[in-house]
């Protein structure tokens, strides 16, 4: 009895293992190594798990004929690295060509730190610096054709005046009236004689 039950249990166990082994080998897996080094796994059976943990065939393993990973961490080919036919990097850190560095045909840097040519330094054809610190020519220094300085501290032009000493003044006051004084009395129609007659009549 015991022998037969042990035998039955053993046979059942062997049958279960055999069924499991048969179920394991009920599918076919093909590994294909392509010329570019990519490995393709193909599973052909209805008993495989299509989506999930053991799905070994995915679209991410299809051969990439460009030789580069198109999207992702190792994408080494981008639009920013297309050849630039101008010979310079157009946009970015090393852009050494800018509009501010176009050749200036005047020979001077037009705008910026080293602009040494300004409108205030245009040639002055009068021979003097017109406006600024060293302007030595002013309207007050225009030539005066009278020969004297017309306005200012050193006006040496005096009116026609004669200076007399004390003796000369007394002599001039006691002198007889000159022709100029006589002419001034004539202007009023009065002579010396008529003046004396008029004075005598007033005393009577």
From Swiss-Prot:
GO terms of biological process kind: cellular response to water deprivation
Topology in membrane: Lipid-anchor; GPI-anchor
One GO CC annotation: fungal-type cell wall
Locations listed in the record: Secreted, Cell wall; Membrane
Biased composition (Basic residues): 47-59, 67-79, 87-99, 107-119, 127-139, 147-156
Family listed: Belongs to the PGA14 family.
Note from the entry: Present with 1380 molecules/cell in log phase SD medium.
Name under which the protein is recorded: Hydrophilin YNL190W
Organism, scientific name: Saccharomyces cerevisiae (strain ATCC 204508 / S288c)
